[in-house]
């Protein structure tokens, strides 16, 4: 598949995407003999996908990982959905976020950059030269000069937290139950997901040798606007955190993307859950706090943590109607 072909599918009207998505889910359920589950986050995308999956398999198992780093509003909403009859199982990881960051390092800049930073740090510490692609301007994995200070910091930068806190608990349960995942991600969310979809060429991937490695990404060709349109047209209930300005309901203090001027995740956390914000800012790696690491990352872009900005108040960060 080409990028142009993906973009053509992304321009389909919503009703066509819904039909396509139901076909994708139906094919996956059939090929897997019904042995499937929905990786449920409690966010808008996976809530829309839950409603679509339940059209074809009303009793589909939806697994929610309470990582300990979720918005309280999301956890409350998931429990409400469970109480209302959705087949939701709430599970937990084996480690707390605090312990994961202390052992592996902080999630900074982006998943791709933090992964490459960690690999490069390992090479440098072992006396090996940096991989060629780090400096190749044509390489997808080139690391921008402004982030190379992370090669030498006292604290580690790593993308391992997502694996430990989210993916591993899901996989462990799926292996125990013999189920393959349906996941609510979209190609439009990142360059990496776009490249993955173009390479795959379709929403479903099947592994004949190890069926549990098969997976379905039925919302791949959807956009954020499609999700909101579907929510409005079908009157889908969402967690109330969305009415308070949040756009992404992942881990509350994840450092991925916080360096962008339009990212208000940390400001919202500080505004809505100040005690949780203060608690997470004190997480450590190698004796350095998350606050210190974030402060250094934001400084690269001339930005500040929401409680350290000398020029802004909360009234500057949000519409006064939201406060």
List PLM regions with ranges.
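ATP/NTP-dependent adenylation/nucleotidyl-transfer catalytic domains that generate, transfer
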Residues: 2, 210-212, 224-323
């Amino acid at each position: 598949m080409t990028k142009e072909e993906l973009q053509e599918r992304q321009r389909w009207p919503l009703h066509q995407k819904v039909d396509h998505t139901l076909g994708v889910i139906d094919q996956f359920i059939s090929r897997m003999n019904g042995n499937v589950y929905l990786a449920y986050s409690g966010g808008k995308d996976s809530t829309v996908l839950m409603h679509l999956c339940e059209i074809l398999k009303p009793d589909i198992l939806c697994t929610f990982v309470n990582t300990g780093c979720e918005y309280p509003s999301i956890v409350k909403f998931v429990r409400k959905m469970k109480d209302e009859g959705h087949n939701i199982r709430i599970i937990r990881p084996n480690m707390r976020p605090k312990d994961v960051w202390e052992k592996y390092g902080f999630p900074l800049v982006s998943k791709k950059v933090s992964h490459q930073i960690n690999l490069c740090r390992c090479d440098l510490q072992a006396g090996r030269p940096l991989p060629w692609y780090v400096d190749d301007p044509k390489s997808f994995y080139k690391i921008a000069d402004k982030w190379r200070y992370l090669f030498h910091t006292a604290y580690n930068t790593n993308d391992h937290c997502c694996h430990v806190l989210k993916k591993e608990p899901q996989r462990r349960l799926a292996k125990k139950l013999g189920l393959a995942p349906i996941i609510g991600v979209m190609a439009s969310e990142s360059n990496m997901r776009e490249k993955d979809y173009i390479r795959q060429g379709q929403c479903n991937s099947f592994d004949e040798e190890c069926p549990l490695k098969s997976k379905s990404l039925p919302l791949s060709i959807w956009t954020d606007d499609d999700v909101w349109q579907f929510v409005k047209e079908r009157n889908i209930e969402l967690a109330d955190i969305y009415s308070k300005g949040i756009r992404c309901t992942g881990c509350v203090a994840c450092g991925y993307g916080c360096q962008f001027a339009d990212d208000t995740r940390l400001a919202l956390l500080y505004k809505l859950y100040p005690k949780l914000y203060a608690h997470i800012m004190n997480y450590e790696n190698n004796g350095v706090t998350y606050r210190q690491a974030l402060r250094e990352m934001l400084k690269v872009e001339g930005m500040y943590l929401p409680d350290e900005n000398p020029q802004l108040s909360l009234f500057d960060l949000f519409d006064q109607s939201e406060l």
